[in-house]
Amino acid sequence: MGFWDAVTDLIDAATPWATVEAEAPADTPAETAPASESTEETTAETKAEESAPAAEEPEEEAEEEEEEEEDEDEIVDPKETLEEECRNSKECAPAKHHYDECAARVTGAGADNKEDCVEEFFHLVHCATQCAAPKLWNTLK
């Protein structure tokens, strides 16, 4: 296959007016009597299969519950707890005070107030992160 044959094949495949031919359907003999017997067999088989998974479902549910219990026993992220302690510490008290005042102003003003407390929130988070970082590194070492 040459270079131009490959290019031509790509162009033929990409053109929207390319001819697409489907495969012919498989020839199946139409028999009425065996078809009714096979449907009876399949309904009996499906009923048996439907009852079997019902017995397996409680086992699967029990396994899922055990996995959920194992997930609950996982270690709590120390970063979250350290940041919470720092937010409530003396070091971040001014930032927390400003954020709490802003939150009270915004919630008390209702829908007319266009102020938000994003800046105060970021100051509080920054303070908590800066406070918690050295403590976190010490616990991870």
Curated annotation (Swiss-Prot):
**SUPFAM superfamilies for this protein:** Non-heme 11 kDa protein of cytochrome bc1 complex (Ubiquinol-cytochrome c reductase) (SSF81531)
Record-stated family? Belongs to the UQCRH/QCR6 family.
Q: Name one GO biological process term.
A: mitochondrial electron transport, ubiquinol to cytochrome c
Which protein, by its recorded name, is this?
A: Cytochrome b-c1 complex subunit 6, mitochondrial
Q: Where in the cell is it found?
A: Mitochondrion inner membrane
Q: What does this protein do?
A: Component of the ubiquinol-cytochrome c oxidoreductase, a multisubunit transmembrane complex that is part of the mitochondrial electron transport chain which drives oxidative phosphorylation.
User: One Pfam family, short name please?
Assistant: UCR_hinge
